Amino acid sequence: MMSKTGALLLTFMILVLFSMAAADALGERFEDHEQKIREQDAGVGLLSLMGRAVIECSKCDTDCKTQKGCIPVAKTTNNPTYCIC
C-alpha cells in the first residue's frame, strides 16, 4: 500500500503533467495567431511597396466608391477590409 506522502507526490506529478500539456497547447495557439498576423501585415506592406496606397476600411467605404481604380482587398481578423487605390 502507498503511503500518504507517496500518494500526495503522485497526485502532484499528475497535476504538473496536465498543466504542462495545457500550457503547451495554449502556446501553440498563440504562435499560430501571431503567424497569421505577420502574414497579413506582410501582405499589406507588400502592397504599399508596389507604389499603391492602402486605405483602411473606414475610408474605403467612401473613397473607394468615389475614386476610380480603388479595389477592396483582403479581409483580416483585426481590420475588416483594405482598399488599394
Curated annotation (Swiss-Prot):
One of its GO terms (molecular function) is toxin activity. GO terms for cellular component: extracellular region. Contains 3 disulfide bonds. Keywords: Disulfide bond, Secreted, Signal, Toxin. Residues 22-52 form a propeptide. Its main location: secreted. Expressed by the venom duct. It comes from the Eukaryota. It is found in: Secreted. Residues 1-21 form the signal peptide. The cysteine framework is IX (C-C-C-C-C-C). This is Teretoxin Tan9.6.
